[in-house]
């Protein structure tokens, strides 16, 4: 289990459901495995980006990337539909493209200590950004921007 200060706002939401004994119903309603969301809630597993996308209208995506005690900007977003995460259509991807166009992909990666190969794989669509990648880019791109279209 996580230390109390390491809990994100998204985990706190799941822990609240556990306390009220409503997590099983929540999992049935949103088509998730109880064991899976339980493990995410206690911090044993990180939430995959696809899970954050599927729950975006229930738990704001930024809630997964900021720990309790950190302020979370719950930005407004369009009520887009769809169950499949198409990150190349997201605001976050567009912002990453504009940053890379201005600085160059290798320069951006070098300046901020990012792995160039991982950045290239995301830019070319060969690999989706993981939870940890989205966390590492959060100083440049708001995490919720990866989960909503413009």
Give short role names for the model-derived ranges.
Residues 59-80, 141-150:
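Short C-terminal boundary/hinge segments that cap the last helix of small helical domains
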Residues 7-11, 23, 48, 52, ...:
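Short amphipathic alpha-helical segments that mediate assembly, nucleic-acid/protein binding
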